[in-house]
């Protein structure tokens, strides 16, 4: 120990020396930094204090060595200069690091803080002093200034003192160094002490003096040498030699032989419990299953070598008790190992000794494990059900009692409970059989009880008890079965279940459902008897009491019989409760009844239920139950009536309750007739079914009673009785007399009526069925594709019709008798009125109408007749009763019209779905025919009218299809903007049954339906007729049957002349006084208002729409479009005349002033225009035009004549091309701007331009389908920025230029196209392409150069060059920056849909089926998808809005839609043709009959605003 301490003491003088040296350094530093002279205090004599009033705080202090460095150097030099001779200049103290010294703050920051504080105080003072204006405020202002000045002076005096203190502050730095040095030394001492303690506790813990080696010391002292090395050194550094694997194998083999030899000698003493002995690798493993396993070996070959115990493994396990760990702790196992090894060393038979020792230990351990498991069960899951009666570890006995009965005895203390176990199980070790292990004994004994499996190693008391419970439960159930059979011999008791056995008892003889079976089982945990009936409640009193009675030891046969009777009654009551759940009754408690009603129940049995009828709350059904020997349970039903303060029982008939055909009643309404000889099947129905039917019967009788009383109030005779045996069902309310409610004689109807009754159906819901049975029905179905209703075996020509059942269900959930009576009367009135008209019609039908129509259906409340050539038109007749009083004027017939598939297609395999859409035109006049039928009740006349007029009306109805005609160009020409520039092209409506009017603009045609298959058509346009050549139109179709009626019928005056429109314009308003002679009037184009008589075939041909050259039209449509176009063309030409007054922003400024109107008639317009020749616009050369209605083709044509000698290119072929282009492109287009462009093109005559234009038109019209280049002249231009239309061909008169737009594409249907826009210089005869594309400009230069060389006109040369390059793929310009056509639909209005089906615009109540949409050719009036653009490729981009509105005015769709009165499109139409100052033509008739916007002519000096500007869209 002294040698370890010496170094510590050796270092002490050095530390003392260092300490003395440190003290001398401190003294020298203090002497070095002493001041040379004392410093006088501050003049103020006050000490420096830094507080919050000066604006400085400790949080704002920062280190500032930079700003104090200069002052520190000056002070140090001054101090050292005075004492340099005595002390050295170098400071012996260490330097203080930056973060270890005191905190500092820069002086400039401190000054900034002070200045900012003063500035803030001045600002606050200035704001406060402005508010003090009175004398008192003046005094306060002075005081504030004094206080501010004093505080500011004091603050800056402190700063001055601080600055003076900085000169001597350097002397304080030595204190900081001393403090830092002391802290550093203190930390050294602390670290040294910590290190010494760590060395003492760690490294020096084992440092001790070694033992003295005597032998080496003697050798050293005597011999002087050291010859022996200690074995510790050898063992530490020289490892022992390892044996080889072969040697190891030999050793283990030898050990195995020795062990086998030793064990063979001890084999007679080895216990038989050791089931397995394994010898391997020199080890012997002995295994006792379920107890232990040991490993032993021999460490020598001699006989005296003892057995060595290597390992013990206890196989007794319980993971729940040990929580996953072995039951024996390793320390305990080591102790066992040592004790057993010592016992084996002294034992004569070590193997037997080891077995006896470990077997005894394992048996004790197994018993302890079972005790712990039982304790857990007794405290947990099987609490109060098992008990540990005895546990003795020494005797090794464990007694467990189960199925404990708890009872109280008078001998016990209050609160104590006596626990008696019904059964016991004893687990013990037999002293006479030590090798047998634990054994089990049961009290009382029974076969197949639970056993312990000791060989498994994991004993379980739970498994033992579970196996025991199963046997005990079966024992108890068998005993209960014997008791039940002895008490009730007729009771059928069955044992069911294997793992969970139970007894099943059928309480009632007819019990078949498991829910009604009683199940008796035993609770395996406590041994109690459990009874359960699924259909009854689990807490049912009788069920629980019966289970307790069976569990008790005192259960007599009488007690069992009593409980079984109670349970049977309870089961029947529950059956009845469930059977009436779906019926309109509810169970009420006796406490809910009134006191006087309870008195009536005094004598009734206690087992009863009371049912209250929901619809008749004054009636109660009392059902009582009582046990009976024969019927098991006897049921008695009584009806209790509670009215006011009186209650009484009503006697029920026995046949209502017991004599009902329940099976037949279930099949009610299915038309199944039971055999008459078959007896009632009541026996096959259960008791509750009969009760349910009885409840329903009573409910029906109560309902019929109320209903019969209400019918008798109305004067209707009734009889409540049952039907005959072949009619299924119960009661029925038969109606016997209705004479008092029928307003007319109806004897024929009642002769046909066999039975009229009302039945109640309450199977699914509470509904009534009004049932009537008829015979000799007037009309039956006789369509060709169907079969009439006739009996088998009867002749087909029998005149009397078959009897039929008419059973109709009234889907009403109301139980009001008044409502039912009203519905019954309404149904009777409907049948009577329908029969009245149908019976009259049936007489004529058999003689005449069966050749022209067929009966689709007659059901007494509805008649459906198909008529027409194909029997595809339907007339649907019904009668509606609106009023309460029968025969009121409010009642009316429903007369609707519809369609069906033609009869010839019903049996055909192929159906043409692409045929023309059809609709029933009679739907236009359905309201008129309905009113007429209401007045006359004559269905014969109605059907005669329908059959006679269907053919012409189908043809005329083609004009009722909704088609819109664009008015955008026209509205721009006349000035005012129209929000919706479209109008209906045609409007067809009916004035009466025989008069129709077709309106197109201000042209109105009246069509009269005459007898003898004749039609009369006349012009009834307002103020004067306007249809020139109307007679010629029909005469061209059929001259033999067309004639003019001699008697001219006056045109009816307007119903409201003030709103009919302004006076019609006259042609003189648009013509100047000219000296030209007028042409002679063609007599074929005469105008007349006399009716034109024709046949049905003629009008059908005139209205037959066909596809002609890509346009769907008919002769009458072509004629009316021509008349309308002439009127619009006249207004267009007037805008091109010098008299036109144009707007500043009008797009027609470049197209006016060169047209003069010569003459205008309803059938032609003559005008002239100045030519554009090489000298510019020359007024002396004219082009003469005549647009006229051809009397042969009855379509518009044009005649163009140039003055003689003014146009050499006006050859016959070129003029024919120009006129053909007008007929095929300009007129079908129907656009006013297109007409302006056409006139501009035809009046261009400079340098044979007519030839070039004719070539262009020929290329457009004669484009072959196989050509890769399609060229089209653009006639209309749409400005995408202003949304305005304009002529695409314009003339700039001052510059003498004309603008051309040519569309080039691959085909007419191609969506991609290019626009060639160029300017033709009229005087210079060359073209200019205003494009940034250099190729286009180069191409124009080439054409101009060629024209100069060869002469001619460059227009056609340029277009031809473009075509050639387009075919070769060299030209594909991208000049589509301003497309020719774009959207023109107003953005603030949504355009309506295309075409609605006829049902959308037909009269109310129409049943015409929905027709498909418009089949018009899609496209705008000037777009490429229009009818004419598809043929001639005029334009490419469609106009905005739906395609249905992008229509050519002359294009006609397939018939099938209706533009009838009441259509919402009537507000969007532009009525009439166009006159000056208005969009709608003067004198035009608005479509429809009522509800159209009024129009008053403007007074002089007032501007006109079209009424459409003020119409709300969409209309409300």
Swiss-Prot record:
Pfam families: Med14 (PF08638), Rgr-1_C (PF25308), RM2_Med14 (PF22981), RM3_Med14 (PF25065)
Region (Disordered): 22-98, 1434-1516
Localization in the cell: Nucleus
Residue stretches of biased makeup (Gly residues): 1474-1483
Keywords annotated in UniProt: Activator, Nucleus, Transcription, Transcription regulation
GO CC terms: core mediator complex; mediator complex
Stretch forming the signal peptide: none
Any one Gene Ontology molecular-function term assigned to this protein's record: transcription coregulator activity
Bias kind Basic and acidic residues: ranges: 72-83
GO biological process entries: regulation of transcription by RNA polymerase II
Ribosomal protein keyword on record: no
UniProt key word Nucleus: yes
Predominant localisation class: nucleus
Compositionally skewed regions (Low complexity) per UniProt: 34-47, 1463-1473, 1502-1516
InterPro entries the UniProt entry points to: Med14_N (IPR055122), Med14_RM2 (IPR055113), Mediator_Med14 (IPR013947), RM3_Med14 (IPR056879)
Purpose of the protein: Component of the Mediator complex, a coactivator involved in the regulated transcription of nearly all RNA polymerase II-dependent genes. Mediator functions as a bridge to convey information from gene-specific regulatory proteins to the basal RNA polymerase II transcription machinery. Mediator is recruited to promoters by direct interactions with regulatory proteins and serves as a scaffold for the assembly of a functional preinitiation complex with RNA polymerase II and the general transcription factors.
Subunit structure: Component of the Mediator complex.
Family: Belongs to the Mediator complex subunit 14 family.
Entry protein name: Mediator of RNA polymerase II transcription subunit 14
Organism: Caenorhabditis elegans
Underlying gene: rgr-1
